Amino acid sequence: MTSPSAASEGSASGRGSKAWSCSAFAVALLLLGAMLWTLFEKNLVSTLTQQGWTRELYGISAALTKLRFGIGGSAIDQRLYATLARSGLTEEPNPDAGVRFPDNLRDAQLLQSALLQALTIDLPPPRSANAKGEYIELIGFSGEDTGLGAYTYLAFRTFGVNIPGLTYLYFVIVTAALVLYGIGHGRSVGAMAAVVAVVLALYAVVCADFVNFLGSSAFFRGPGIDVKDPRFLGTIAAIPLLHVIVMWTRPPYRLGPLDYTVVAMQAAIFAFALQIRSPVVWAVLALAAFWLVAGALVLRRGRSLRSLWDWRQSRSAPVPVVVLAVLLSAQLLAAVNLHPLYRAQGDVPRHMFWQGLLSSLQLAPDWSKKYGASANGATDDAMPAQVARIAIMKLPPEERQQYLKRDGATKRTALEKFSRLAFFDILRNDPKFVAHTFFIDKPARAWQSERQFFGGLFSGLPIWNALIPAAAVLFLVVLAASNADALATLLATAAVIPFFIVVAWLPNWLVLLNPMVMIDNFVWIVVFLVLSTVIAAAAAIRFVSGAKRRSAVAASRG
């Protein structure tokens, strides 16, 4: 579990250090087990949720398209998509099935039957592009992140074609990241304590009421999500992110080839999260800024620029270079392998930014009064689509076709373009309205989401779910109180976490704010609260113990 090149921290060495590190690793694994058990308690393993089923339908369809016909590049066979819908994965289930929406999403037998129908239905491979370059039987993800298709395909290959495999794969990936973390930081007791805090934060989010089929607390009563939802799957980047943070916050140590291999593998998990959930790009921006500031501070303290490029130093430039190289390579690989139907149909293989930005203006209380008519009264996600449609219809007939599909629907690329134009038009003509939305209405909505998260923690769950975090924090306090070097590492790590909390909030602030999209922000807030509590309690214990020892020494001398 430990890299031979990683040096131990000061006095925290030998058997005591190894025992604490192994104990921390075991606690992190137990917390992951508690997470999975909680999902079983909430009946979220074999089922789908109202908030996430449409995204998962795209992912399942893409995975089955690749499994059956070997067609990748995030292409979806429309016939398989339709088969899944007819078999029950829809908001309008067949009355003969004897189940209504959303109860069909909780019927594990019906969902499995739908998967088997799509897997076994007798179909020839989809036809290639016609003379006009059109793919009649294939579609894309319609403006959603395409990495969910790769995730679902990997789950089906690993666990078979079933819904529970989508949950199990999450834990396989997070466990792999935890093992890699242990290999890279196993000799640092403080670093291992920090990863316990991250896993504890993930556990806390699973215990929130919005991670449920339907919230039941006083703070959240709407449809929720589960770990299969891309908005939660983005958290597979949490441990890889902590891995590279701690490389710069723990005391400097020597690196070897194994350390760089581990960093590259963590970066690969990070890149996978970015494909599944594009707003995770916040972590890339935060890391880049963190490295630049940390590097500047290192140079200011007297180290030469040449020493900063010493690849054997943990606080060296080659580490971020490796991480960024892996992330960039993954993005390029995904772009190269993208099916040509995306270009042909004007689809976008990621979450659409400008559509979300324009749609977020609806958070303003007076949006409907001021701008509702300009969108023909359309609301929510339909509003940007209607705005784009109106703009396209104002164009001369010969210019419209480039923005429309063969069935007359608006292309996703056109939706992004006209959403951007509409947003800047409102910003230019009514900057006060936009400023009020972003600096008054959105922060208020963010605060409401924070209350929904913390207010709904452990709602409807047995008491043991709340006792687990208390036991984990108590363990961390004892660990930190017993080891001054570990306490120092935790203090340095906690000091930079607020920066990551703020940056994690930026994608939500720019687009929409609700508990489901703010999960990354919640994770790092909980990490900071846990580390702050542990540091304060451990410091107090060490202070009292030191005072008692000094008193005893003084008494013996007297």
PLM feature spans:
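Membrane-proximal stem/loop segments at transmembrane-domain junctions that anchor or position
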Residues: 62-133, 341-445
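Membrane-interface transmembrane helices that cradle and orient dolichyl/undecaprenyl
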Residues: 235-262
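Perimembrane helix-loop-helix junctions
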Residues: 2, 14, 283-328
